[in-house]
Amino acid sequence: MVLTARQRDELNQAIHQYLLISYQQSAQVFKTEAVVKDGQIEADLLEKKWNSIVRLSKRVITLEQQVEQLNEQLAQAQAGKIQFNKSDDEQRLTPFEKFKLEGHRAGVNCVAFHPQYQILGSASDDGSIKLWDYESGHFEKTLKGHTSNVNCLAFDPTGKYICSASSDLSIKLWELKNHTCVKTLIGHEHSVSTVQFSDHGDFILSASRDKSIKLWEVQTGFCKKTFSEHQEWVRCAVFSNDEKQMASCSQDQMIYIWVIDSGQILHQLSGHEHVVEQVKYVPEHGAKQILTQQQQQNIQTINLLVSVSRDKEIKIWNTILGTNLFTLSGHDNWVNGVSFHPDGVHMLSVSDDKTIRVWNLKEQKQKKKIENAHDKFILKCEINKFIFATCSVDQTIKLWLLS
């Protein structure tokens, strides 16, 4: 491979920077012979590129092994040695444990995937945020700054920032490049439960035990709007797919659908018989398939919402009509979190019953159950393509492979 002039200059600058640390004379000779230009370059760039190459090499080896296995299965299928049936779909969706990440000293409340790099963030009751390489399972960095439990974290769409919510009443914005806190958002009067970035990264939505939801402007750090109608602790608030609306759920057992611009409540959804822990909008491509199955094909009704509750149930709502489409039952204890498979139709849920369950939303059925996925209550889960992450009161994070 031939490097471009720009790539060659950047490489020479990185080598020169590396030599300067311990080999000053060699660095001067190299600078002269390679005609290295003075310029701004990211610290430790050469080491970072080297580590990236090692990680990518491991990933290539893993993918080559998977391709080899799939080719063998394909050859067997073509030879008639494998008969596919309905159970294959169940097998395909079975999570297989890849890594158990240990390092937190208290329960882990939340996990989040970086939108571009192989970084997983975790938030814990020990007051810290940890960053992990989810391909290798290696610990990378601890972010410290909160003085109480860290309840939630989220990456912005560019991957430049990470936002954290804490019981110390604050929201912190961290710059990943330097692992430093660049803003602290103050305004909530009790624990901050969740945070979420808007799709363009301009705004942050937060929910709090002070019974309010706040919309923050990232650039200024100012609170643009406060929504206060819930009667109890707001457990979660999320933007709708088009970001014109939002959904919130609360300890008051209610789910509210809000129009963000006006601050008005569009619908009050009731039906759960205990605290509603989380709400999430179904991806649009999955919502369309579900609505087609439900014979509700109006293109305007693509904002489907999933809610999970301590009443052990998962409910799916049409937020345009304000109606409950169906309810999924099966968990034996509080349901704490859900995440969607890339196909948009399958969903995974986690619970205090220590199980992971896989659901088909079109069929409204449970397809798979993983018993004792953690030693204690499982609090949250997230999916990034075909990597599934869970976190638990047992102080660990687990990474699972999905096909």
Curated annotation (Swiss-Prot):
GO molecular function: dynein complex binding
Protein location: Cytoplasm, Cytoskeleton; Cytoplasm, Cytoskeleton, Microtubule organizing center, Centrosome
A Pfam family this chain is assigned to: WD40
Domain of life: Eukaryota
Chain segments annotated as coiled-coil in the UniProt record: 51-87
InterPro entries, sorted: Coatomer_complex_subunit, Dynein_regulator_LIS1, G-protein_beta_WD-40_rep, LIS1_N, LisH, WD40/YVTN_repeat-like_dom_sf, WD40_repeat_CS, WD40_repeat_dom_sf
WD repeats, residue ranges: 103-142, 145-184, 187-226, 229-270, 271-327, 330-369, 373-403
A single cellular component GO annotation: microtubule associated complex
Keywords: Cell cycle, Cell division, Coiled coil, Cytoplasm, Cytoskeleton, Microtubule, Mitosis, Repeat, Transport, WD repeat
Domain LisH as annotated: residue spans: 7-38
BP term (GO), one: microtubule sliding
Record-linked CDD domains: WD40 (cd00200)
Biological function: Positively regulates the activity of the minus-end directed microtubule motor protein dynein. May enhance dynein-mediated microtubule sliding by targeting dynein to the microtubule plus end. Required for several dynein- and microtubule-dependent processes.
Family statement drawn from the similarity comment of this UniProt entry: Belongs to the WD repeat LIS1/nudF family.
Domain notes: Dimerization mediated by the LisH domain may be required to activate dynein.
Protein's UniProt name: Lissencephaly-1 homolog 2
Species for this entry: Paramecium tetraurelia
